[in-house]
Amino acid sequence: MLLFWCEPDYLLAMAVWSALLVVALRMLLLWRRRLKAASNEVVEARRERSGSKRSAQQTGSVVSGSVVSGSWKLKLAFSVWALVALLTSLELGFAAFVDTTDAFNATNVCHRWFRRHVDPYRNEAGFRDRRELKAGPQDDVRQIYFFGDSFTIAQGVDRLDDRFTDRVEAELNRRRGSTGKEIRVANLGEFGWDVSLIEGMVRATLEQGYRPDVLVYVYMLNDIEGYDPRTEIAIRSIQRSRSTFWLWTRTYFFNWMHFCWQQAQAGRTVDYFPHLADSYDSPVWQNVRAALQRIKERCDEHGVEFRMAFFPFLHNLGPEYPFEHAHQKLAEFCDEAGVKYLDLEPVLTPHGDEGLMVNRFDNHPNERCHALVAEAIVGQLLQDQIEKTVGEESLD
């Protein structure tokens, strides 16, 4: 149950709060019983035959006024309690049953998703992969490493087997059958990585003696943002708008709703995507191009074949896709550098109406999108790997 993945202090606070709601309800019910008893007294007073008629009327009038005053106050109190109970139910329901992500890993629901579906499955190198990396040449297998960001690590996809990297390995080995060497795919993706970080990780991986046969950089179009101050300013402005109020930071439902409100506000005030698109027509692109060239040269030095795949922004797919020029820049680099590549925009655009994103607030690819990407990678980017592994086995 998802509640067991919540923080202990949250569970304690909600237990205390729920107990207070129960106590408040009991007090309201006691109040209602007392008002009912007072109302009965009014009836009895009006029926009272002893004493003067004027005295009975005065007594009934006083008690009746008190009952009427208490009655509307009780109704108001019950209404407030019902509203608070409803909001508490929404909070507990959200905490107990909602297991998803947001685009920026900014909500408590998303943080918990990472604790459930990512952190327990990290290998010794820190990557979300069921298999450990082995340094040195691996003569008995053919290795393919995928580097990338959260699109590669598969944010929002619960099962490892549903990621495109795991699907690629399964399909390549299925097509290989009993011939050739086993093909092993390693996922070296991480949330928030850009070109500069991936360049450093590629360098460190190769210098530490890891020798994949093919290294694929799954490039996401926001990988350029670390080189452009404008996009960094836009991101910081979003981060600065985050509240420190406990109701927005220590809950699940209210935290999510606050995030949605922030996203709506940011969409009207922050020009993140326009700046990002402009980056590819500015000198910033030359810095990214140089970094890609260095990755290619580093791979060549260690006898590793470098390839690329370009991921589009899924929420922008369509006839007026604003990042078409960015894909062209990347393709031109690959053609000039002799890098085999796969542009996923033409692959995914025909399926844009099938719902390729994790959810409305997270534009990372979902399981359906990962399946399409895996099929394209096997059929267009890595279609030669089966022949190569069969050829290598015959040479051995």
Features from the language model and the residues they span:
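Membrane/wall-proximal cationic-aromatic binding patches
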Residues: 94-178, 348-352, 360
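Membrane-embedded alpha-helical segments of integral membrane proteins
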Residues: 1-33
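Membrane-interfacial, low-structure loops and terminal tails that flank and connect transmembrane helices
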Residues: 33-72
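Short, amphipathic alpha-helical "lid/cap" segments that border enzyme active or binding sites
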Residues: 195, 199, 285, 289, ...
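Hydrophobic membrane-insertion alpha-helices, especially the h-region
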Residues: 78-92
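Conserved SGNH/GDSL esterase-like catalytic core that processes O-acyl groups on lipids
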Residues: 145, 154-240
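Serine-dependent acyl-ester chemistry module
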Residues: 220-334, 339, 344-355, 359, ...
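Histidine-centered active-site loop/cap adjacent to the catalytic His
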Residues: 340, 360-396
